[in-house]
């Protein structure tokens, strides 16, 4: 166990301990997925966006995050030594903040992946619409808090709003 009492003995144990932590903090989990090849995620009820920001983004007012409508808070769990797709989105921007552990990030406006930026707990990164990006698990499990900033009020982003440029797991590009 560690200072936040997350069990890092296996991914299943880690996922369960984060689930318990989120419920203990009073979050309503609208959807969860522990079957992603890189880890998994918890989608938090959008009505709790300010509560989420208070805890995971230093209490910033959610109105300062809004672009064109709703916000969607999520918790990403990243397995060690895995890479999410090199990808971009057409209908959202994202704000990431490392809550637990360390991750790598690659981002730029072209399809060329460049150097890795290493982020530690408390570090934050902004992803613009159509900006290529990838999260990378380093040596241990990590938690990244994320807020989707929807850019199209009439057609909010969803899990299908992913344009994959490269994928380590053979998913469709």
Predicted regions and their residues:
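A short, N-terminal "cap"/entry segment at the start of jelly-roll beta-barrel domains
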Residues: 1-71, 117, 162-164, 169-173
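Double-stranded beta-helix
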Residues: 2, 136-173
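Conserved hydrophobic/aromatic beta-strand scaffold that supports enzyme active sites
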Residues: 73-77, 95, 116, 124-126
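Glycine- and acidic-residue-biased ligand/ion/polar-headgroup-sensing regions
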Residues: 80, 90-110
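Structural motif
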Residues: 102, 132, 141-143
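Short acidic-glycine-tyrosine-enriched beta hairpin
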Residues: 109-133
């Amino acid at each position: 166990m560690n200072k936040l009492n997350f069990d890092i003995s296996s991914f299943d144990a880690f996922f369960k301990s984060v689930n318990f932590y989120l419920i203990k903090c009073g979050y309503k989990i609208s959807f969860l997925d522990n079957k992603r090849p890189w880890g998994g995620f918890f989608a938090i009820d959008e009505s709790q966006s300010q509560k989420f920001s208070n805890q995971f983004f230093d209490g910033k007012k959610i109105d300062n995050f809004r672009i064109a409508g709703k916000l969607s808070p999520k918790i990403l769990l990243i397995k060690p030594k895995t890479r999410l797709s090199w990808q971009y989105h057409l209908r959202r921007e994202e704000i990431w903040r490392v809550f637990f552990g360390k991750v790598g990030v690659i981002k730029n406006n072209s399809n060329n992946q460049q150097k890795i930026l290493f982020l530690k707990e408390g570090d934050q990164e902004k992803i613009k619409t159509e900006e290529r990006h990838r999260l990378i698990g380093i040596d241990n499990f990590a938690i990244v808090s994320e807020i989707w900033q929807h850019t199209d009020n009439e057609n909010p982003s969803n899990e299908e709003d992913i344009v994959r440029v490269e994928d380590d797991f053979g998913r469709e590009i």
